[in-house]
Amino acid sequence: MSSALLLAPGDLIEKAKRELEQRSIAPLLREKNSTEAKSKLKEDGEKKNKSEKEENKIHDDRRVESQESEGSGSADCQRGAGSRGADCATSTGGGDGGAGARTGIGGGGVGRVDSRSGGRGGQGAASDGKGVGKSKTGADRVANDGATRDVGTSEVSSSGITSGGLQGRGGLVAKSSECGGEPLDRTGGCSGNSKTEGEEAKVGGGDRRIGGLATQGIADFVKKKIGVEVQVFSKGMSNFFTVDKSLLKRGGLGREDILHQSDIVKEIRASDKKVKIIPLSTVKRMIAEFGGTEEDEIKAVQTQSSSIRYISNRMEDVSRAKAMFTAPTGDEGWKEVAKAATQRPNIMAYVHEGEGDGLKELLHLIDHI
């Protein structure tokens, strides 16, 4: 019996994976990149460029506003000098949070404050006496005994918070030593990770059912019965599956496997009650837990005399294909493969146009070629 190759759509091959494995047919699938991946990459690049342009425009607008505001403050300061005893002084902060402008009462006039931030978020206004200064943002600052607070804004002093600076218009970015330097969110917590320990466990797969059988001999017995490989139990698994003793005896397993299974059950009940013991009393129960097919059906499949040993949706396999099966599909590259295959004079082509996905018809074709 020769080894032949069958062409079929990729999504149909994926659906038939278990049945193909039972028939010892190897799938040869085209890599999922090409058109779909290139389209997504192009779309992501366009979005990134658009985002960068918008961000640059925002920065430019803010820089222009800042320059206009500084120029206006300087002009006002010059116009007010010398009238009614007004005194105007400007100071630029430097280093880490340098102090801002200082002002006092000159005669009967009230000084104007022009505060410029310097270093990493350094800004503020202070007064030797009692006075009212007006900042560029329009918020009134009340200075008294060297302590400064903002009136009508949401900026307040907080212990354990290092100065961050102003972001946008009045948006304070603060970092806390308790959060390991991560930014604080508006609820007062660390914005870097807001999940609880239980949520983290679920995300990490802690709630997934992981289990196994007592010995490799029992695992081989289960595979023979339902055609599914089940791993051997080890520490850290959350479930231990026990196969009924009568099933094991009828399957020809020795006394050693049965006793080892009993010993693990006793050990779990005595010391590790977190592990769940799940009994498998029948073959149908095994299928319910692990999937698969009953032994008689597996034997019937294995005795089928099909010459097909490979199934593919790749263009490079068209030249050596014996037959082609096609059906409505979501495989984007399949149209070109099918077109190339039909140009060969000696290839057998089968088309599914009825209801359903064509899986049953594909397997029927495989078993009769």
From Swiss-Prot:
Where does it live in the cell?
Virion
This protein's superkingdom?
Viruses
**What transmembrane ranges does the database entry give?**
none
What segment(s) does the record annotate as region Disordered? 20-208
Q: Note whether Phosphoprotein occurs among the keywords.
A: no
Q: Where is the composition biased (Basic and acidic residues)?
A: 29-66, 196-208
Q: Per the record, what is one GO cellular component?
A: viral intermediate capsid
Database matches in Pfam families: Orbi_VP6
GO molecular function, a single term: structural molecule activity
Q: Locations of Gly residues compositional bias?
A: 92-111, 162-171
Which UniProt keywords are given for this protein, alphabetically ordered?
A: Capsid protein, Intermediate capsid protein, Virion
Name where it mostly resides: virion
Protein family: Belongs to the orbivirus VP6 family.
- Protein's name according to its UniProt entry: Protein VP6
Which organism's genome codes for this protein? Answer: African horse sickness virus 3 (AHSV-3)
Q: What is the lineage of its organism?
A: Viruses, Riboviria, Orthornavirae, Duplornaviricota, Resentoviricetes
